[in-house]
Amino acid sequence: MAPKKDKVPPPSSKPAKSGGGKQKKKKWSKGKQKEKVNNMVLFDQATYDKLMSEAPKFKLITPSILSDRLRINGSLARKAIRDLMVKGTIRMVSTHSSQQINTRATCLT
């Protein structure tokens, strides 16, 4: 009589568990929270003076750059750019529906 063959269970669709015992449950990661910026919505005299003296010296002037450097909100930065353009201290390079790019006004004489 031939020796008995070990019965191999048919392959199942479920993956085999590696290791025995209970596995640790995966913990939910706590979502990252952005730090809230406390930007000004109105100019005070010190910030306005800083805008008038420093902004015309920037090579690239956009609302986001003014907002970041002067701690003012975006709508105030757009108004400040408009004010600087009226005074002639900066000039427009390009405009887009969502962004305006300006630079310092240089004399071409």
Swiss-Prot record:
Q: Which UniProt keywords apply?
A: Ribonucleoprotein, Ribosomal protein
Cross-referenced Pfam families: Ribosomal_S25
Cellular component GO terms held in the UniProt record: cytosolic small ribosomal subunit
Q: Would you say which domain of life the source belongs to?
A: Eukaryota
Has the keyword NAD been applied to this entry?
A: no
Q: Which GO terms describe its molecular function?
A: structural constituent of ribosome
Q: Does the keyword Ribonucleoprotein apply?
A: yes
Which residue windows does the record flag with biased composition (Basic residues)? 22-31
Q: Where is this region: Disordered?
A: 1-36
Q: Which family is this protein grouped under?
A: Belongs to the eukaryotic ribosomal protein eS25 family.
Q: What protein is this chain from?
A: Small ribosomal subunit protein eS25z
Q: Show the taxonomic lineage.
A: Eukaryota, Viridiplantae, Streptophyta, Embryophyta, Tracheophyta
